[in-house]
């Protein structure tokens, strides 16, 4: 329900975002009888769990196998990017460079058994398989002629008939002069996204909102554009029956990584990026060396640790959208070839320019930390290689890489570290309270997850397009519990930003699992989860303390003032 906003706005002012008005939704309703008889929901069948919960960045198979087909097909369609092969190196789709050395002489550690699979699973399944129909969440990409391009489960070729059915539904509605957005059938929700000749569909019974599922389809489309650019549409203009699946051959790992991120990465719905906590002097040292590469023609330079930004530098008047950062890091981290050798690969940043290729030079300094240099020049490999060498030397001398590894181990925000309320510290316990009772009260408070029952929070700076989140406490250490909380945050976000009933400033929800509190101002958004027995007034006080805590740490947890290259 709505309520008056808490007092004490501790965040620095910044211009609020004003999203464009949303178009009216067009929905259809199907009866349960319209679904196949064995297309049912099994509450104990968790398709995400049987593939493992993504707790670390995967190191899965190389996507270099599709290089020749990708290049040849686009050349036939007259939409090929400028070929980088003229520079004397092999650099298509992240393949290893002929002249490059390994990024790290140490052997790569093997993924844990819990890590998500190296390749698509359940290839034996199709739409006639009972196990396929029990999956809680499907994703499909198909062309406007009904040809399958990608599916999360099963072999795309075996799902040609199912893809044709989805295409027929979309065409039927469009022929009547309307546009289909979603269909509800029993507990299933089918969400459609039409992008020219490309159709994206999600079939889900996870109780996620329409807005959340549509946002996930938008990210899948963006990931596809990052690999191919929007100019692939010209292929369909020349041949409506063009088969695009070979162009994405070998990219299953990229899409699997993206789909798993929908269950753990707040960037997928906040449209913001997170930074690695670092001392201000360390981050400034990293930014300074990235700025000093003007002679190499770099548009953007990113130093990252896993999916967290260490430093970001861009050319003047050039900005990098958080979604582009997320999709680029997902592409790099899910491709093993980037980890094993320095690479130079054509990519597209859909929010920057969806019609053009840039070229990404990628080099891993260690297992987690990597440098990405983006340029418009197809012959810039050797210049960027020299720039990387200079950057690496400075980072080593300034101990930046050492501090990055230390931060990765030690700098997580923990609820237990939230500073105590100064007003409560000045009040002494009544003398009639025994020490045992006082200790019992303190223990009960900490046992439920932190001060006043706070379990977890996510804080987004609207002005900076950055977010920070706390570490999960022991009480939410189970992956299923974490995914459940993440989905609760997604629903809360969708509710707060619902244009039909909102936007809202605050919301306080209580259910059997959590108390969820959201507070939105022109400067920040705060999402917090409390013990289900938490008191509303105490929760508000704790949220004020969290915001003050974030303000005290802002120079360490945020990147302030995106630096520009010294051109």
Swiss-Prot record:
This is Vacuolar fusion protein MON1 homolog. Belongs to the MON1/SAND family. It is found in: Endosome; Prevacuolar compartment. Residues 7-19 have a biased composition (Pro residues). GO terms for biological process: late endosome to vacuole transport; plant organ development; protein targeting to vacuole; vacuole organization. It comes from Oryza sativa subsp. japonica. The keyword Plastid does not apply. One of its GO terms (molecular function) is guanyl-nucleotide exchange factor activity. GO terms for cellular component: endosome. Residues 43-52 have a biased composition (Acidic residues). Keywords: Endosome, Guanine-nucleotide releasing factor. The keyword Cell membrane does not apply. Plays an important role in membrane trafficking through the secretory apparatus. In complex with CCZ1, acts as a guanine exchange factor (GEF) for Rab7 protein family. Promotes the exchange of GDP to GTP, converting it from an inactive GDP-bound form into an active GTP-bound form. The active form is involved in protein trafficking from prevacuolar compartments (PVCs) to vacuoles. May serve as a linker between Rab5 and Rab7 protein families in PVCs and mediate PVC maturation. Residues 1-52, 65-129 are annotated as: Disordered. Pfam families: Fuz_longin_1, Fuz_longin_2, Fuz_longin_3. Interacts with CCZ1A, CCZ1B and RABF2B.
């Amino acid at each position: 329900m709505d309520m008056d906003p808490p007092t004490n706005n501790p965040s620095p002012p910044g211009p609020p975002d004003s999203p464009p008005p949303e178009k009216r939704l067009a929905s259809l309703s199907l009866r349960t009888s319209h679904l196949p008889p064995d297309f049912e929901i099994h509450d104990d069948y968790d398709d995400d769990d049987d593939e493992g919960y993504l707790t670390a960045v995967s190191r899965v198979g190389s996507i270099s196998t599709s290089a020749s087909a990708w290049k040849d097909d686009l050349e036939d369609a007259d939409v090929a990017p400028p070929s980088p092969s003229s520079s004397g190196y092999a650099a298509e789709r992240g393949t290893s460079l002929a002249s490059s050395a390994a990024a790290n002489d140490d052997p790569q550690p093997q993924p844990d058994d819990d890590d998500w699979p190296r390749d698509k699973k359940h290839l034996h399944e199709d739409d006639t398989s009972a196990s396929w129909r029990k999956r809680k969440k499907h994703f499909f990409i198909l062309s406007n002629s009904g040809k399958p391009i990608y599916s999360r489960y099963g072999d795309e070729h075996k799902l040609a008939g199912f893809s044709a059915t989805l295409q027929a539904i979309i065409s039927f509605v469009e022929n009547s002069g309307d546009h289909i957005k979603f269909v509800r059938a029993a507990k299933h929700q089918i969400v459609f996204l039409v992008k020219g000749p490309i159709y994206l569909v999600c079939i889900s019974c996870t109780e996620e909102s329409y807005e959340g599922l549509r946002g996930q389809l938008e990210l899948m489309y963006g990931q596809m554009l990052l690999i191919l650019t929007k100019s692939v549409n010209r292929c369909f203009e020349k041949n409506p029956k063009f088969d695009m699946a070979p162009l994405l051959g070998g990219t299953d790992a990229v899409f699997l990584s993206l789909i798993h991120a929908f269950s753990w990465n707040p960037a997928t719905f906040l449209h913001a990026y997170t930074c690695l906590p670092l001392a201000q002097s360390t981050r400034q040292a990293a930014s300074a060396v990235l700025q000093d590469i003007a002679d190499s023609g770099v548009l953007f330079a990113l130093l990252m640790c896993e999916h967290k930004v260490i430093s970001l530098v861009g050319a003047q008047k050039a900005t990098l959208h958080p979604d582009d950062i997320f999709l680029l890091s997902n592409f790099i981290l899910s491709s093993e070839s980037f980890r094993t050798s320095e690479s130079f690969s054509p990519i597209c940043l859909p929010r920057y320019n969806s019609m053009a290729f840039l070229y990404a030079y990628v080099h891993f300094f260690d297992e987690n930390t990597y440098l990405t240099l983006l340029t418009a020049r197809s012959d810039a490999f050797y210049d960027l290689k020299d720039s990387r060498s200079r950057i690496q030397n400075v980072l080593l001398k300034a101990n930046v890489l050492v501090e990055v590894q230390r931060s990765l181990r030690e700098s997580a925000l923990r609820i237990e570290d939230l500073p105590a309320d100064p007003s409560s510290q000045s009040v002494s316990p009544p003398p009639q309270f025994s020490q045992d009772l006082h200790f019992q009260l303190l223990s009960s408070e900490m046992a439920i997850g932190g001060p006043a029952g706070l379990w977890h929070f996510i804080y987004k700076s609207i002005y900076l397009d950055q977010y920070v989140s706390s570490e999960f406490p022991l009480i939410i250490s189970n992956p299923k519990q974490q995914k459940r909380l993440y989905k609760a945050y997604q629903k809360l976000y969708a509710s707060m930003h619902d244009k039909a009933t909102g936007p809202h400033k605050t919301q306080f929800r209580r259910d059997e699992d959590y108390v969820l509190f959201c507070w939105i101002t022109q400067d920040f958004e705060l999402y917090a989860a409390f013990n289900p027995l938490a008191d509303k007034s105490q929760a508000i006080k704790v949220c004020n303390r969290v915001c003050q805590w974030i303000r005290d740490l802002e120079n360490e947890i945020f990147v302030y003032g995106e630096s520009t290259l010294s051109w």
